[in-house]
Amino acid sequence: MLSINRKVRVLVVDDSAVARTFLTRGLSSYPNIEVVGYAVNALDARGKISSLAPDVMTLDVEMPGTNGIDFLKELLPVTPLPVILVSSLNLKVFDALAAGAVDFVRKPDGTESKQSFLDSLAQKIVVASCAKVRRRAAVSPAAPSLSSVSPAGVGGRSDLDRTIIGLGASTGGTEATLEVLKRLPADIPGMVIVQHMPVGFTKMYAERLNRLCRMEVREAVNGDEIRRGLALIAPADLQARVVRMGSRYTLSCLPGEKVSGHRPSVDALFSSMASAVKCPMVGIIMTGMGLDGADGLLQMRRAGAYTIGQDKDSCVVYGMPMVAYDIGAVAVQASCENIAGVLMAHLKGDK
């Protein structure tokens, strides 16, 4: 777990007495976490936030009265408090992330131990205590036009048909990745995306991106061909690696050991690209705690890839991009909102 020199003050918000007791007792067992109180609904939470001054709040998405999403929309513009969602397998979690929540965990459903759930939540709470809360505007389903792109596409067909883009993100990355993808055209070179996310959510995340972006986006399956106009989301709990198959490239999505503490791992993806890809490639590393992806991005740059890192000011957590920049893996830094423009300029050969 990330080490900090103080206890993180946590407010637990859940309408279920059983859930509140479980979370309060469970989180209190961690030496770097102090549960300072609990609230049973949004109205109760507003008062507790004012009186208890928590560093982080855990929030149930589904609550009677004002639900978690509406509560965040009201709260965060005036009180930018890091929030971790505690949610069942539900699309509403992405609406809450769009409203400004930092991260989320899936409620225990019998597929993982309660201790594993608490360990994951505690880790995310500590990370969230270091996060920068960014209030995000609602995303329009219509992607902004790119006036520099001709109807024929973003440039010469041959190079762009063969180009592969890898993107990795963690905490804060679900909305940051959307910010990038919604600014890209439908015929973007083939993309592979690793976003650290609990099991069950990557398919829903891919479906959401597919609705909001111009290119096709879907959760990858083992053996998928990487092709122009398609963005593949690496499935949770599988390692995703690019494999060369003659003149084609496919994505391997298989069980395996964690790499850099994660499965899927950005390092595993980027390292595979550095060793397997013999055509133009781009690596993008975005917001997230830790160092996953930094070494792999360095390997990509040494193999001739163009590499982009999200800048500090626009990151929810400036961890992975910072490490990548510090070791020389990043060719150019850009804000979340400008990464797409930097990428497009590179693909078109603009200087």
Mark where each language-model region is.
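Conserved acid/base catalytic micro-environments in cytosolic active-site loops
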Residues: 1-11, 16-28, 32, 38, ...
